[in-house]
Amino acid sequence: MPTSTLLWSVGSLALSSMVLPAAASSYELVETWKGEDFLTAFDFYTGADPTNGFVTYANQSYAESTGLVKVNSNGTFYMGVDHTTKLSTNGPGRESVRIGSNKYYDEGLFIIDLQHMPGSVCGTWPAFWSTGKNWPTDGEIDIIEGVNKNEANEIVLHTSGTCQVSSQKMSGTLTSTECGEDAGTTGCVVEGTQGSSGTPFNENGGGVYAMQWTDEFLKFWFFPRGSIPSSITKGDPDVAAFGTPMAHMEGSCSIAEHFKAQQFIFDTTFCGDWAGGVYSTSGCPVSDSSSSFKSCVAYVAENPTAFAESYWEINYIKIYQTGVAASASASASHVESAASVAETISAVREGTNSVVATTTAATIAVTSTADAETATTMAGATTVAASTETSAADENGSSASTSTHYVTMTTTICPIAESSSAAAALAGGSSEATEASNSEGSPAAATPSSVTGASAEANESESTSAAVTTPSTSTGASAEANGSESSSASEAGSVAGATPSSVSTTGASGEADSSEGASAAATPSNVSSTGASAEANGSEDSSASSEAKTVAPSIPSSVTGASAEANGNDSASSNAATASNVSGASAQAGDNESTPASAGANAGSSAAPSSVSGASAEANGSEGSSSHSSGSQAGAHSYGSVPSSAAAYGRPAPSSSSHAFATAPSSTGSSRVPTSAAAANNAAAATQGSSASGSNSGSSGHGSSSATTPSTPVFTGGANKLTLGASSVLSVLAFALLA
């Protein structure tokens, strides 16, 4: 290679390493909610109020029919309370609405444009806040909150243990520095500026709140209607131009450790632990000098018209995260000399929601870690120095199985990790579960109870099928179809849930030789794939697609180490689609022509029984063969297809919930420490739906606890960096010299 060409290649490589970080760190819009979106992207909570409020939360159909919620003619979303009915102080509380997003979101930039929020009215306690699945461990962020006649917003953080923040440059006033529960339930508090909430906010035409969440800090800005930055109105927010935040939460506390993926919640309650507790000292009418709470309830019950202004009117909410689109785009345009992309999806023991994309100038390695709880994570990219040797471990140092493959870089990288508590996790990172199809014979896919060590072989065969049926628990099941034409070996997942009760087969095997179109099928009940990868090397017009190279956002359950390989193929395609629960599944199709190889299933029902370990299938040296690792999957390729399963969105221990859109109930709750009376309310409502409990008390804090929420997506973003390692440069130099 001429010296000039070599220097050009090295120079381009070095330049790309400097350009990529800037491109990758920009915020990309990942979610917009406005108008009708609040009726589909949020669930209506109908349980007892865990803060002991004098309130009755309406379900969606009732709320829509009575006008408690509606989409206005100008496209804004209205969410109000009953302001016409006089009530008995001994009866049910005033009707209101509480909604929570059916997805969870990690770090990013969150912008809400409000036309109106509940006014400064005695007895009210409105809030826009978020909570993690496990309160207080995963944290709570109170973005907008106030009680009674408050006119200045309170921004509060809650989490577990100890979590200190210190005084930073901000326009608000830091009044409490300890966010952790060890010091009580007050949380760390910033008192906002006058007019940042309530009646003055509405009189000024509303405004915009922005929250920036990173590993190191949480910042909050409030912009009155006439002072909204142009970058926000243009849809390209520039936090560097936002100015001094109203609240800046940063200190010795590790934000990354104490605040995990959050669900966003709107509600308006009445009285309750905070508003009722301070009612008599808030300048509100007192009817019972012996009880602030009773005075609050009496006022709320007897003065419905006072609450005509107690409504939310939302223009939009936009969520931005870093790196996903920008990283892939920059990689394609600036790293022209990069010949491959390494995609590594690792199955990690439960305990992490994070997804990290590891990028180098010559090789892009995407490492995704899958939470054993139910969550789908869309990653931003946090990148480090190059290495094709990858491994993952959870916070406790638990090791994770890792599968690294290389594919030609022809696609956008959008890593997703997901897991499901509804389905048993699979072990065996080296095991393979695949289907090699294009057969003339049809594979049988019945699904009995448990099969151990089942195998099926179809060698040098024509039109013969051998089937091994394995739903509930299938260990070491394998299927091989070698040297055959149009051979098929498959591991299907949860085929419409046909699972007889207890049929146990150990060491069953079937062989069919000298047949064409041979098939061997092993069908586990509920297959969940985490970490699917695909390879297509040395091929013409080859592609590794969808959930392997661009992992589809709304894969229900968990993907662990599944891989598909298509080597030396013409027009080879490899597809890793992921369904319910498969660990270490792999498929190989070598030296084939027109060979699709895929891991994953795009349709089926998520029936969720057991687990599959070490199932494998191989189809080698065949023409027109395909290999698949199929599992059970509902609603693939759509973020919103996974039903929301957060039954109670924060403010602990609701006893029941009713989801208009969720078919699978769950238990997520949050609270400000319910009293024994609240516990009684919760018990009384226990027959209405799923429940969860938590505790929290004091002037602020909602909290969430006992969250098992199956199949609830989690979207994560992160900072994007790229370091050009010396080894990468040397590798390129060596390659160039050899060439």
Swiss-Prot record:
Its membrane topology: Lipid-anchor; GPI-anchor
GO MF annotation terms: endo-1,3(4)-beta-glucanase activity
Sequence intervals crossing the membrane: none
Domain GH16 residues, every copy: 31-283
Glycosylation site positions: 59, 74, 396, 459, 482, 526, 537, 569, 581, 592, 620
Propeptide residue intervals: 718-739
Lipidation (GPI-anchor amidated glycine): 717
CDD domains from the UniProt entry: GH16_fungal_Lam16A_glucanase
UniProt keyword annotation of Glycoprotein present: yes
Subcellular location as annotated: Cell membrane
Listed PROSITE patterns: GH16_2
Region (Disordered) residue spans: 431-718
SUPFAM superfamilies with a match to the protein in the record: Concanavalin A-like lectins/glucanases
Superkingdom of the organism of origin: Eukaryota
Signal peptide: 1-24
GO cellular component entries: plasma membrane; side of membrane
Biased composition annotated in UniProt, kind: Low complexity: 431-442, 452-499, 507-522, 561-587, 597-641, 674-713
Keywords: Carbohydrate metabolism, Cell membrane, Cellulose degradation, Glycoprotein, Glycosidase, GPI-anchor, Hydrolase, Lipoprotein, Membrane, Polysaccharide degradation, Signal
Compositional bias (Polar residues): 523-532, 539-548, 654-673
Protein task: Mixed-linked glucanase involved in the degradation of complex natural cellulosic substrates.
Sequence similarity: Belongs to the glycosyl hydrolase 16 family.
Protein name, UniProt field: Probable endo-1,3(4)-beta-glucanase An02g00850
